[in-house]
């Protein structure tokens, strides 16, 4: 696929603004903050699928494609790629829109990864997923 024709995959699960407090020593947005936003967004979708509590058990293939700047609008898109007996595997993409730095208005993918969540009961023990239709 031509990168100019690329669009986010999945549904928007989180949208926020990159702030100065989220920068690293170089002035770019800290990768750990981006990963945290991805985990929050992915957990929202996983909770909908599990119909309850979930915990993150792994992050695979975290790829940072481009840096994120202060003032960028950060959006996390997620879609379920697999479910197991208790686990939910979700592909998450971070897309940013430049609103306060050049090139203004540009919208592109900056980060992607696969997160695995496990449904848990009130005691934190794995819980079997109920049948569902993927959201």
Curated annotation (Swiss-Prot):
| Class of enzymatic activity (EC top level) | hydrolase
Q: What Gene Ontology cellular component terms go with this record?
A: cytosol
Q: Which residues form a coiled coil?
A: none
One GO-annotated biological process of the protein:
acyl-CoA metabolic process
Q: What is its EC number?
A: 3.1.2.-
Mind telling me which Pfam families this protein's record contains? Answer: 4HBT
Keywords of the record: Hydrolase
Domain named HotDog ACOT-type is located at 8-123
- Tell me which InterPro entries the record gives: Cytosol_ACT, HOTDOG_ACOT, HotDog_dom_sf, Thioestr_dom
SUPFAM superfamilies according to UniProt: Thioesterase/thiol ester dehydrase-isomerase
Q: Name one GO molecular function term.
A: long-chain fatty acyl-CoA hydrolase activity
Family matches, as PANTHER family: ACYL COENZYME A THIOESTER HYDROLASE (PTHR11049), ACYL-COA THIOESTER HYDROLASE YCIA (PTHR11049:SF5)
Q: What NCBIfam families does the record point to?
A: PRK10694.1
Q: What is the similarity comment for this entry? A: Belongs to the acyl coenzyme A hydrolase family.
What name goes with this protein?
Uncharacterized acyl-CoA thioester hydrolase bbp_254
Species in which this protein is naturally found? Buchnera aphidicola subsp. Baizongia pistaciae (strain Bp)
Q: What is the lineage of its organism?
A: Bacteria, Pseudomonadati, Pseudomonadota, Gammaproteobacteria, Enterobacterales
